[in-house]
C-alpha cells in the first residue's frame, strides 16, 4: 500500500477525542514541550483507543526534540533504549514515554532486506508514521487544534475494523518479523479482521519469526498471555500457523488437520486460553498484579503434556515420579525452554506444576487432601493450578487468591524502593572499616 505525503487532518467535529479524556500528566508533557518551542503529539495506541472510546493503557508522546533536550525539560526522567533512545518521564509511579520522531532509513527504502536493520535516524512526522507497524497505530493527535493527523489511512481502517501493515506487507515482515505478532495481537484485542494482503503475507512468511531473538519473542508473547484476549490471539495464531513458530512442541499433536487427536487438543488449548483470559481480566479490573508467567505458560502446556505423556492419567510415585519429572523437564527444555530463552528456575517451576497435576487432580476430585501434602512448599501453587485446569474442563470458576503468586520477569524495583526494603529486613551492624562511634580507627571495637 502506498501512502500520500500529504496527511489527512481529522478535525474536532469528526472525531470523539477531547482533552479531558487524556491523562493529565501526558497533557502536562505536551504543554511543556510546546511552551519550549518543540512539537509534541499523542501517538500510537493512545490515539487509537481514544478514537474507539476505549481507555488507553499507555499515553505515548512523539516530539521533534532530541532525547537530551527532553531530559533538560524534565528532571524526573531517564533515557532508555538501545536501538533507539527514548525518554521516560515519571509521575507518581507512572511513566510517560517520549520518543523523537524517526525516519525510515535509506536502507529500508531502497536497499536489500534484512531482519532488524538499524533504524535510528531522526525524521519528520510523515516519516515517523510510515515506519510504524500498523496503520491503526500510525496516528498523531495534537492538542492545540484538537486534530488527528493521519498519513497512513489509519482512521479509515479503524472505521472499517481492519488491521494491516503500513507499507508493503512482505517487506515489512522481512524487516522485522515480530510485526506479525503485533498484527495478530491487535486484531484479537480489538476484534478486528486482518486485511487479505497482510493475512496472506503472514501465512506465507510466518517461519521468519524464528529469525528473531528468543527473548524478544518471549517478551512479546507474555504481553498476549496477560492481555485478556489470549483466546482470540490463539485462534489467529493457529490459523496462520504462527503459533507453531513459538510452540514447536505443539506441531505434532495439532498438525494433522483431519486427525482424530487434533480436535480434542485444540479444544483443550482454547478452553485453557479462556481461563487465562478470565484471570488476566480480573487482575486488570482489580488493579492487581496477575498470575506469574511461568504459571500461565505451564497451564497452556497441559494439552501438550497430555498428548505426549498422557499426563492426567499418570500414576507414578517415588523414584518413578522423579524419573518422569526428569523426562518432562528434558522434553520441555528441548521444545520450549531454549526456544523462548526461559530461565532454568522458570522451567523447573513449570515442571513442578505439570508433574504434580495428576496427583492434585485425584485429591481435588475426592475433595480429600492429606495433611502431608498441605505442608509442601508447592501446595498453594499446585492446588490453584489444578483448580484452573479443572475449570477449563467443567466451566466451574475457580476462586483466585487475593494476593497473586510470585510473578516472574517482573520489572526490577527502583534503587530507592530496594534500599528501603533492604533496610527494613537487614540486621544493623558496623563493618570492620566503619568510622562511626563504635569503631576505633576504622576497626570494630
Question: What is each residue range found by the language model?
Answer:
Residues 1-445:
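Catalytic cores of the polymerase beta-like nucleotidyltransferase superfamily
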Amino acid at each position: 500500500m502506498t501512502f500520500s505525503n500529504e496527511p489527512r487532518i481529522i478535525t474536532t467535529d469528526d472525531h470523539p477525542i477531547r482533552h479531558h479524556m487524556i491523562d493529565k500528566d501526558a497533557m502536562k508533557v505536551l504543554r511543556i514541550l510546546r511552551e519550549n518551542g518543540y512539537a509534541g503529539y499523542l501517538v500510537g495506541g493512545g490515539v487509537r483507543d481514544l478514537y474507539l472510546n476505549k481507555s488507553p493503557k499507555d499515553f505515548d508522546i512523539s516530539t521533534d526534540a532530541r532525547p537530551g533536550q527532553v531530559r533538560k525539560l524534565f528532571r524526573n526522567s531517564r533515557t532508555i533504549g538501545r536501538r533507539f533512545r527514548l525518554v521516560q518521564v515519571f509521575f507518581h509511579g507512572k511513566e510517560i514515554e517520549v520518543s523523537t520522531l524517526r525516519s525510515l532509513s535509506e536502507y529500508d527504502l531502497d536497499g536489500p532486506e534484512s531482519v532488524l536493520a538499524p533504524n535510528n535516524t531522526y525524521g519528520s512526522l510523515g516519516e515517523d508514521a510510515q515506519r510504524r507497524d500498523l496503520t491503526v497505530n500510525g496516528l498523531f493527535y495534537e492538542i492545540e487544534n484538537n486534530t488527528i493527523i493521519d498519513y497512513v489511512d489509519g482512521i479509515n481502517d479503524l472505521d472499517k475494523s481492519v488491521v494491516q501493515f503500513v507499507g508493503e506487507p512482505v517487506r515489512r515482515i522481512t524487516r522485522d518479523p515480530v510485526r506479525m505478532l503485533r498484527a495478530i495481537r491487535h486484531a484479537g484485542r480489538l476484534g478486528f479482521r486482518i486485511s487479505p494482503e497482510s493475512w496472506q503475507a503472514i501465512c506465507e512468511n510466518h517461519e521468519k519469526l524464528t529469525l528473531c531473538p528468543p527473548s524478544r519473542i518471549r517478551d512479546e508473547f507474555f504481553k498476549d498471555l496477560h492481555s485478556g484476549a489470549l483466546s482470540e490471539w490463539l485462534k489467529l495464531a493457529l490459523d496462520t500457523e504462527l503459533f507453531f513458530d513459538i510452540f514447536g512442541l505443539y506441531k505434532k499433536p495439532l498438525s494433522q488437520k483431519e486427525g482424530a487427536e487434533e480436535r480434542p487438543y485444540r479444544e483443550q488449548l482454547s478452553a485453557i486460553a479462556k481461563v487465562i483470559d478470565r484471570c488476566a481480566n480480573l487482575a486488570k479490573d482489580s488493579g492487581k498484579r496477575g498470575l506469574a508467567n511461568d504459571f500461565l505458560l505451564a497451564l497452556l502446556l497441559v494439552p501438550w503434556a497430555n498428548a505426549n505423556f498422557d499426563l492426567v492419567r499418570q500414576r507414578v510415585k517415588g523414584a518413578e515420579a522423579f524419573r518422569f519429572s526428569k523426562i518432562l523437564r528434558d522434553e520441555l527444555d528441548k521444545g520450549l525452554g531454549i526456544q523462548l530463552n526461559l530461565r532454568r528456575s522458570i522451567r523447573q517451576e513449570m515442571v513442578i506444576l505439570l508433574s504434580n497435576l495428576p496427583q492434585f487432580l485425584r485429591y481435588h476430585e475426592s475433595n480429600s487432601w492429606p495433611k502431608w501434602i498441605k505442608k509442601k512448599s508447592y501446595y498453594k501453587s499446585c492446588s490453584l493450578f489444578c483448580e484452573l485446569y479443572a475449570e477449563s474442563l467443567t466451566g466451574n470458576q475457580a476462586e483466585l487468591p487475593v494476593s497473586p503468586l510470585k510473578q516472574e520477569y517482573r520489572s526490577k524495583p527502583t534503587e530507592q524502593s530496594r534500599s528501603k526494603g533492604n533496610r527494613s529486613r537487614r540486621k544493623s551492624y558496623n563493618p570492620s572499616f566503619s568510622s562511626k562511634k563504635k569503631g576505633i580507627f576504622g576497626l570494630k571495637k
